[in-house]
Amino acid sequence: MKRSKIIVLLLSVVLCLPGCGKKTDNAEMQQFLKQEGMQLQASGDYTGAIAKYEEALKLADMKVAAEEIDIAYYKASAQYRSGDLAGAIDTYSAILAVKENENSYLGRGLLYVAAKDAQKAEADLNKVLKETKNPLIQGIIYNAVNETQKAKECFEKAKKAEEADAIFYLANIYEKQGDHNYAMILLEEYIESGKANAEGYLSVGRHYFDAGAYEDALTLIRQGISLGESGVLKSLMQEEIACYEKLADFTSAREKAEAYLEKYPDDTLIQREYEFLKSR
């Protein structure tokens, strides 16, 4: 599992901007723009999505409401996924300037980790550690700053409290430590919990793929795709193509490559793969 993908999973985004009660027409247009942004984000067009979210947020007047916060969540997520760490950090700083809260300090602290700004990351994350009693949050913080043993202890405690995400984070730790077999056991447990996200399906699917169990891998990859989570959708679709190729189902592989290129037309690797598949 790549560290950047784990950071994506750790982030919880909240943003508030100044505003005052909005008119019904503005509310309807705001919702429309939000939906457009979500569709663009799901397709991997983060720049377009950010533009839609910003347009929607401009329709707010002088009072922050739940809808503005939700839109801003998507905006910050798109900023992070587009590689705009500075923009995502500014988003968190904006909410913290209005109202301090644990989630925003956590999110900004994790972004500082991703930006390799250890001093600022420590300041934000220590504020959360002093306040939170949640072992999952504690584990997330320790994991982010590479205090692996403390993270493992917190995740074990969270796992006992039936926090399903703790299983995934534990699997990540064991995998990084080279214990791939136990990591796989944990990932399977995570899938069986019924609370797995797309990243979990991708990770387990890749394990099965590497073991040569292509049918099982394909089943898990397709389940992950069905969740529609934009963060790993591109990787899931790539794995789906690879599974069909290994199963010698070149017709399905070609069809999936076509669908992939409709979403990600600039991927030269899959373009070359598609040309190969057309000859099979």
Where are these regions (language model features)?
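C-terminal motif of bacterial Sec signal peptides marking the signal peptidase cleavage site
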Residues: 16-19
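Canonical tetratricopeptide repeat
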Residues: 35, 67-70, 74, 81, ...
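Short coil turns that delineate tetratricopeptide repeat
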Residues: 61, 99-100, 129-133, 160-163, ...
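Register position in tetratricopeptide repeats
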Residues: 42-43, 81, 114-115, 144-145, ...
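Start-of-helix register in tetratricopeptide repeats
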Residues: 31-32, 65-66, 70, 103, ...
